[in-house]
Amino acid sequence: MAVNGCMRLLRNGLTSACALEQSVRRLASGTLNVTVRDALNAALDEEIKRDDRVFLIGEEVAQYDGAYKISKGLWKKYGDGRIWDTPITEMAIAGLSVGAAMNGLRPICEFMSMNFSMQGIDHIINSAAKAHYMSAGRFHVPIVFRGANGAAVGVAQQHSQDFTAWFMHCPGVKVVVPYDCEDARGLLKAAVRDDNPVICLENEILYGMKFPVSPEAQSPDFVLPFGQAKIQRPGKDITIVSLSIGVDVSLHAADELAKSGIDCEVINLRCVRPLDFQTVKDSVIKTKHLVTVESGWPNCGVGAEISARVTESDAFGYLDGPILRVTGVDVPMPYAQPLETAALPQPADVVKMVKKCLNVQ
């Protein structure tokens, strides 16, 4: 009865941090299906409870429960001392957070959209990312910058940009790009516990998607190591490397390609800085073909970096076809729905590129 009650809460989308914690406790012997939103909420709850130095700061994160309800129930549970609402001023949010981190606290700085992290980029890169190096290792800046990254639905140019490649470019930060619930939970908890800056690039569409959470991942001490990709779908004919919501696009494409007898290996990067190139390289050596999939623009993108590394490595000699990329179109994001769809990678785009790489019709 208790199990059924918990599952009803999950199905109805009424799970608060407290309810999810109770569900995990009661169903510890089995796998849970929860949304990415709830996985992040539970991870925040557990880390704030675990360490008195951890606090959440951002716009509408407290009394409103967060713009995407990631912080639902946390202000009521922990109060103003741990959950800080701020004015709409990303520069001040980032600067205050970096100062707090330099003075012994462990802030989780939420940007309602990573598009507006650019308002605080000086603090993120010049202060947080460089302090450890500039101090010859004497200073640590234990801070998490997190928020919705990339396109959602109908939010146009100024809320749709994918900043993965921007932050991947910068030394001094770790950059994680979760896909499913275990990614979101394990990487966020690892980020909070890290002694230097971590940028968590989440996806708004994924927030509402449900994924299984294994008994192991339900543990309050579950963390995922940085720089460890996951083979989301094993295969032998071609390697598809992707991240965040691009993994979902790639998996749908792989299902379609399987109908034609093409067996795709789909790699979920999970983290782009550090990048698990070894997993990519081993897969390319096995399949002898590579396609990358990302939502960001093509110039200087994640796929371009992976392509360069494969070309510069001994995996290049194993390739039986060109390295091809599926990316967002090189334009500011349109608002009109048909144009927005056309500007983003779709499963059909991946199918087409895989067949081109394999030289099949």
UniProtKB/Swiss-Prot annotation:
Thiamine diphosphate binds at residue 90. It comes from the Eukaryota. CDD domains: TPP_PYR_E1-PDHc-beta_like. Its EC number is 1.2.4.1. SMART domains: Transket_pyr. K(+) binds at residues 143, 191-192, 194, 196. It is found in: Mitochondrion matrix. GO terms for molecular function: metal ion binding; pyruvate dehydrogenase (acetyl-transferring) activity. It catalyses: N(6)-[(R)-lipoyl]-L-lysyl-[protein] + pyruvate + H(+) = N(6)-[(R)-S(8)-acetyldihydrolipoyl]-L-lysyl-[protein] + CO2. It holds the Pfam family Transket_pyr. Heterotetramer of two PDHA1 and two PDHB subunits. The heterotetramer interacts with DLAT, and is part of the multimeric pyruvate dehydrogenase complex that contains multiple copies of pyruvate dehydrogenase (E1), dihydrolipoamide acetyltransferase (DLAT, E2) and lipoamide dehydrogenase (DLD, E3). This is Pyruvate dehydrogenase E1 component subunit beta, mitochondrial.
